[in-house]
UniProtKB/Swiss-Prot annotation:
Identification of the protein by name: Uncharacterized protein YegU
Recorded name of the encoding gene: yegU
Domain of life: Bacteria
Hydrolase is among the record's keywords: yes
Residues annotated as signal peptide: none
Natural source organism: Escherichia coli (strain K12)
Amino acid sequence: MKTERILGALYGQALGDAMGMPSELWPRSRVKAHFGWIDRFLPGPKENNAACYFNRAEFTDDTSMALCLADALLEREGKIDPDLIGRNILDWALRFDAFNKNVLGPTSKIALNAIRDGKPVAELENNGVTNGAAMRVSPLGCLLPARDVDSFIDDVALASSPTHKSDLAVAGAVVIAWAISRAIDGESWSAIVDSLPSIARHAQQKRITTFSASLAARLEIALKIVRNADGTESASEQLYQVVGAGTSTIESVPCAIALVELAQTDPNRCAVLCANLGGDTDTIGAMATAICGALHGVNAIDPALKAELDAVNQLDFNRYATALAKYRQQREAV
């Protein structure tokens, strides 16, 4: 069953990413005016300078970088090698011509340029607060058992370090990875979500590097909005206006957790709600829908959407899921 949930997390990541791609980085008002309502895969509009490179049902840098991380984990048989993760991401960026397209976030671009110049990951500052670590962390949530919080945070920090080392970026990645890992263990969403603010607080305060607002407090605000809102549209509007749906970890991670709650953990519903939110739709979609997929397993993903993702992206997620499940079991036995 854990392999099915791991597969669900990987497909959830790709589903949320590809569904949210056409509207990414557009204001909510423009998403509504241009699309009306997104409820299926669409090509990136030529007017969207972040999405114009992508065809219908293609995922973006979020899932591509998650697979760079997964490849590094498989190559090292479940061990975390930050320099290999960094090289994999750089190789993908060069293949995709990501430096010349409006695809890389500012923190990742600076870090990858330094890696390209031969700097070891350990020497990079990488104190940015954008969401590049959280957006790609799902394979790590599949690998790491959610037992000892401190060692979990350390592992996530190590895997994030090629591009992001700040307290906030690491805490955001920890929240997403912890939720996925607990889901793979079969925990209920209500138990998982109640634990996330304290996990976020612990992760953010472990090594303070910024003067950021509290991720734990923002998670609580986002969840309160969803629980008190009068319907889905009102909840989405309030999340967008109050919490924010931007590329910063402090906005996008609380938004993603709140959208899992709003979608009642249904991965297909979650991907649609994220795509219509406005802002960093593909990244919020990738994070939130990965959690939903981990909660319910791959069979909860709409078979038609899954088939389209497979056909367009030439996916072999089964190979990743089998290997990650094996390496997770080895870690659980220690």
